[in-house]
A protein has these predicted regions:
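Glycine-rich phosphate-binding loops of nucleotide-dependent enzymes
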Residues: 1-232
Length: 232
């Protein structure tokens, strides 16, 4: 039994690609394969022309690939600022530059007011943003964001959207965005890749994906599409 089959996903610099699909479609499995936490039984993974299929996560990170996780991966006893600094220093950034980088990212993600608080005391939405800041602290060429909007109040999602756009527009990084917030995905993605039952169901610009009845059927079921319950 294979979690993924015949999936061909390309992520380019300065581009946001949304990755969507029903629960169990294989989204997190794909992220784990791309970042080295799982190893494929066939196929290959390339990072800017280099075959990294057998590289461990740390080596991929040093090569410019960063990610966030669905669940917290922060140092709860350290301050918010220290969490970002540690991530930067771990990527080889000198301590003084790491502190400046942390200040920049905390401001970008609206966390400056929490800079000296222990990470373990953050609300869920703030903890998500800290995960994004830690990923960006390494100055990655590509960043994979796994459910960054989960737990965020709806009023704070536009701020997150602007932060993700800045990763693309100001830092020139490629972004793979996985989230159940479909409005966020549709708003900021340049392309969307749809998985269903471990296979690529569709790929294209947001307008094409929104109008794709196969995508609607994967989420709502064939009966809903046949009854005309789907709005394009």
């Amino acid at each position: 039994m294979h979690a993924l089959r015949e999936v061909n996903l390309e992520l380019r610099r300065a581009e946001i690609v949304g990755l969507i699909g029903p629960n169990g479609a294989g989204k997190t499995t794909l992220v784990n394969l791309l970042t080295g936490f799982d190893r494929p039984t066939s196929g290959s993974i390339e990072l800017e022309g280099k075959d990294v299929t057998r590289w461990k996560p740390n080596r991929r990170g040093r090569a410019g690939l960063a990610r966030t996780f669905q669940h917290s991966h922060t140092f709860r006893a350290l301050s918010v600022r220290e969490n970002v600094e540690v991530a930067a220093i771990g990527a080889g950034i000198p301590p003084r530059s790491a502190r400046a980088r942390a200040s920049e990212l905390l401001d970008l993600l609206g966390l400056t007011g929490h800079a000296d608080e222990a990470a373990g005391g953050l609300a869920q939405g703030d903890e998500r943003r800290l995960g994004v800041a830690r990923a960006l602290a390494t100055s990655p060429r590509f960043v994979l964001l796994d459910e960054p909007a989960a737990g965020l109040p709806e009023a704070e999602v536009p701020e997150l959207a602007e932060a993700v756009r800045s990763v693309r527009d100001e830092h020139g990084a490629g972004v793979l965005l996985i989230d159940h917030n479909m409005a966020l995905i549709m708003e900021i993605s340049d392309r969307i890749h749809v998985l269903d039952q471990g296979r690529t169901l569709a790929e294209g610009p947001p307008g094409d994906i929104r109008a794709n009845l196969d995508v609607a059927a994967a989420y709502l079921g064939e009966s809903a599409v046949q009854k005309g319950d789907v709005e394009a």
